[in-house]
């Protein structure tokens, strides 16, 4: 859950909104804290604490021998625990400087390729808090044209932070952008290759496209703790244009003009990292090249959720980049989904969904999105927990958030029944034990279904729905995209990302973030030493379409390829609206007759297809020749039933039975949110009350938390 992170961001934002002071001598400032920490066994304690936490990571063993993709090594093969132990052994021989230590340990964590793992240093006192304060911006921002050529403009971030900042060769850079003189190299490397490598050691995403996006955004501006580049990497760099001119330029650093720095505690995910920049700088970092086109949306919630019925183009449109609710109106996002769904249901227009830099959020909102976009399907998510050190306790800690059930059964399983139904699996020479995957029922979502918030009002054909994804689509966004994909409920279209990438994964990291580390000693030890609320996910999602008895690969390690890719290589902004509409029209027309022969999930709905079972409906699948096979195949059911894909039959929806203690479960969402907020604020208060002390007593912290 990332709701409380957003709350902290907003609170801290309003506390302090002063201007930033430019730092031209970045290396000199970093050198201030590039010294050994004098606390006895500091580095060893940090590593031991991190090992204790990582022992609970869902994929800690699988990463030693991850599944292959199309016979090749697509995922990192790493032994994180051993790498941490190796780092500790080198520390015993030579005491590192703090910055070098932070670089080393950050690379090890990043090798997991999992952004759900939170491990962030914010510092306790000068000079080490500089790592949490310093923002670094390149002098240029990158725009990739449809023909894949690159333009470079002066970085708008710099002037929003301080409009008096001096950028070397700024006049030439600005004029070349206006005259459309294209950039060919950065530091002597092809621009694309440079962006692939920039900050790559610290990028925790799996797909190449998402890494490219992450690096490209970071190139525009990043926090030093997020991307601790070497001194050589932070020196002046060169840019070369197509006419042969090479200019030297420089990074600019910024520090907030306040002791109450509101940046060091904030960016805990890519989504929050990007959105908080919008908060500070008022408009996106990657600004649009043209601002003439103004889109009037029927509803626009903080530029996170926007939808409209475009009568001119006869298309329904929804844009989204977050599944996080507004802290002041946590149920408002559900009402907005309902509003959009109601408007879309009143016409027969096709629908496009634009996912842009979506870092996820609440899983139940992802499920609502699934039903809003494709209401022929009934969302079901299969989850498992890996049997690691504390995962059973995590289940008990989260028992009020969800329940587990077997297929088609009305009685929920006890935690012991779920946890002790064990599956043993081998990955190479690695054996893991986990619980057998079951359907996870989000209690709040079930109450929403019961109230028929998204009752089926019309039947949208899968070929009349396009999901535009930049490939970064992360966490609960990935759950949304994967479930629609496996149902065959929409055409997946890729944009943005690496223009030269051959493989385009539609989404990534649909991890079941089941964790509560506050009872683990290592968690407290890390907070005492300046690290911000570490998080280690312990659950895994499994695909819903296959026989669960034969499916043993977590969705974390599967790749879902897009159906089409368009030549839009920048993040979505409203000036690109008409481009997306134009591309959608072409694709909708194409899929009336043609299809992607590599996607055997996508369905072509044909209402003339009839089946012996009265509630069953279907259509066609794509043939190997890239046209629709005219053989009728069932894939959906009447409302109040859900489609069972293995037996190809309709199962009546039944309300999940609950214990008497669950009578107030429809309010679980609000209570969970409120509880998380209180706990986080208490931890913050406890931490800052004690941060200036050299020693923090672990038992005292636990007692204070329990009393509160």
PLM ranges: what are they?
Residues 2-19:
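Cleavable N-terminal signal peptides of Sec/SRP-targeted secreted and luminal proteins
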Residues 18-410, 466-467, 506-515, 582-585, ...:
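Flexible, low-complexity junctional segments that flank or bridge functional domains
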Residues 205, 597, 611, 624, ...:
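Disulfide-rich extracellular modules and peptides
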Residues 362-578:
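Conserved acidic, small-residue-rich alpha-beta core segments centered on
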Residues 600-603, 614-630, 641-648:
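Extracellular, cysteine-rich, disulfide-stabilized repeat modules with beta-strand cores
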Residues 654-673:
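Extracellular juxtamembrane-to-transmembrane boundary of type I single-pass membrane glycoproteins
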Residues 673-690:
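Single-pass type I membrane-protein transmembrane alpha-helix
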Residues 685-705:
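Membrane-proximal cytoplasmic juxtamembrane segment of single-pass cell-surface glycoproteins
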């Amino acid at each position: 859950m990332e709701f409380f992170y957003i709350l902290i961001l907003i609170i801290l934002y309003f506390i302090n909104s002063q201007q930033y002071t430019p730092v031209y001598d970045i290396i000199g400032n970093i050198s201030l804290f590039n010294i050994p920490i004098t606390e006895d066994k500091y580095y060893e304690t940090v590593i031991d604490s991190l090992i204790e936490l990582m022992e609970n990571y869902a994929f800690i063993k699988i990463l030693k021998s991850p599944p292959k993709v199309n016979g090749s090594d697509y995922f990192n093969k790493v032994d994180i625990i051993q790498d941490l132990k190796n780092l500790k052994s080198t520390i015993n021989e030579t005491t590192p400087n703090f910055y070098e230590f932070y670089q080393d340990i950050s690379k090890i964590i990043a090798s997991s390729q999992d952004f759900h793992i939170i491990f962030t240093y914010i510092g306790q006192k000068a000079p080490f808090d500089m790592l949490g304060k310093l923002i670094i911006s390149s002098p240029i921002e990158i725009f990739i044209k449809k023909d894949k050529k690159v333009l470079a403009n002066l970085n708008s971030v710099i002037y929003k932070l301080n409009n008096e900042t001096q950028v070397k060769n700024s006049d030439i850079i600005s004029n070349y952008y206006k005259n459309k003189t294209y950039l060919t190299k950065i530091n002597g490397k092809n621009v694309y290759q440079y962006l692939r490598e920039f900050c790559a050691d610290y990028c925790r995403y799996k797909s190449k496209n998402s890494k490219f996006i992450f690096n490209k955004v970071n190139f525009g501006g990043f926090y030093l703790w997020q991307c601790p580049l070497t001194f050589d990497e932070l020196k002046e760099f060169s840019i070369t244009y197509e006419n042969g001119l090479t200019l030297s330029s420089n990074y600019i650093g910024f520090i907030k003009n306040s002791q109450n720095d509101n940046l060091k505690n904030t960016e805990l995910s890519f989504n929050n990292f990007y959105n908080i920049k919008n908060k500070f700088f008022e408009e996106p970092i990657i600004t649009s090249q043209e601002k003439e086109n103004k889109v009037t949306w029927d509803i626009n919630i903080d530029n996170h959720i926007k939808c409209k019925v475009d009568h001119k183009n006869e298309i329904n449109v929804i844009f989204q980049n977050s599944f996080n609710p507004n802290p002041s109106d946590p149920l408002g996002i559900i009402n907005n989904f309902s509003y959009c769904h109601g408007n879309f249901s009143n016409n027969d227009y096709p629908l496009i969904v634009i996912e842009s830099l979506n870092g996820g959020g609440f899983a139940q909102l992802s499920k609502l999105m699934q039903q809003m976009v494709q209401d022929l399907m009934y969302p079901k998510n299969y989850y498992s927990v890996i049997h690691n050190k504390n995962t059973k306790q995590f289940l008990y800690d989260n028992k009020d958030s969800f329940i587990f059930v077997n297929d088609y059964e009305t009685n929920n399983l006890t935690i012991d029944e779920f946890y002790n139904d064990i599956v043993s699996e081998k990955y190479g020479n690695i054996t893991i034990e986990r619980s057998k995957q079951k359907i996870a029922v989000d209690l709040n979502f079930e109450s929403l279904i019961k109230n028929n918030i998204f009752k089926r009002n019309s039947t949208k054909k899968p070929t009349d729905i396009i999901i535009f994804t930049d490939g970064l689509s992360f966490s609960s966004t990935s759950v949304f995209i994967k479930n629609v994909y496996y149902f065959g409920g929409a055409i997946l279209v890729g944009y943005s990302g690496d223009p030269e990438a051959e493989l385009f994964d539609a989404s990534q990291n649909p991890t079941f973030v089941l964790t509560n580390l506050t009872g683990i000693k290592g968690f407290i030890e890390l907070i005492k030493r300046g690290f911000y609320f570490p998080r280690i996910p312990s659950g895994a999602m499994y695909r819903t379409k296959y026989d669960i008895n034969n499916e043993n690969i977590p969705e974390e390690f599967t790749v879902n390829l897009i159906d089409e890719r368009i030549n839009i290589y920048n993040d979505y902004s409203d000036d690109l609206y008409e481009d997306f509409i134009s591309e959608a029209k072409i694709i909708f027309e194409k899929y009336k007759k043609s299809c992607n022969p590599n996607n055997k999930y996508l369905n072509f709905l044909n209402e003339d297809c009839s089946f012996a079972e009265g509630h069953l409906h279907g259509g066609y699948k794509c043939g190997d020749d890239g046209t629709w096979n005219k053989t009728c195949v069932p894939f959906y059911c009447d409302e109040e039933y859900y489609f069972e894909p293995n037996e190809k039959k309709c199962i009546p929806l039944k309300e999940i039975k609950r214990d008497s203690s669950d009578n107030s479960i429809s309010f679980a969402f609000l209570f969970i949110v409120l509880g998380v907020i209180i706990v986080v604020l208490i931890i913050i208060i406890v931490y800052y009350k004690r941060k200036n002390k050299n020693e923090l007593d672990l038992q005292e912290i636990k007692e204070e938390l329990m009393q509160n």
